């Protein structure tokens, strides 16, 4: 099963693979530089916050990736978490 952490880890991995910080990747995608900050991944009550589909789509378009590519990274993150 893909979790909140898998999705955020996939976004972090995409940034790393492209030699970008998460902040730089956000800027390149036309997003606020703080979009991918760890502090924004949960709300004030500790409830997990997922990135929107719009945000994920901007990342995929900027990095010329498909949703299948993103799903594969999330799936790999999921399997690594259970090992």
Regions found by a protein language model. Name each.
Residues 16, 27, 61:
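Alpha-helical residues within the helix-turn-helix
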Residues 8, 19, 50-53, 64:
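Residue at a beta-strand N-cap/secondary-structure junction
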Residues 21, 32-35, 52, 66:
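Short coil turns linking two alpha-helices in DNA-binding domains
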Residues 38, 61, 68-83:
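Short, charged recognition helix plus adjacent turn
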Residues 1-24:
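A short, Lys/Arg-rich alpha-helix, primarily the initiator
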Residues 11, 25-26, 36-39, 70:
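Conserved hydrophobic/aromatic packing and binding residues within compact polymer-binding modules
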Residues 30-49:
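Recognition helix of helix-turn-helix/homeodomain-like DNA-binding domains
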Residues 44-61:
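Short, basic-rich loop-to-helix N-cap that marks the start of a DNA-contacting helix
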């Amino acid at each position: 099963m893909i979790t909140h952490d898998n999705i955020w880890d996939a976004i972090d991995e995409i940034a790393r693979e492209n030699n970008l910080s998460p902040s730089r990747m956000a800027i390149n995608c036309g997003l606020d530089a703080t979009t991918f900050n760890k502090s924004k991944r949960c709300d004030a009550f500790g409830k997990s916050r997922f990135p929107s589909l719009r945000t994920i789509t901007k990342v995929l378009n900027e990095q010329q990736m498909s949703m299948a590519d993103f799903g594969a990274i999330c799936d790999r993150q999921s399997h690594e978490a259970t090992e």
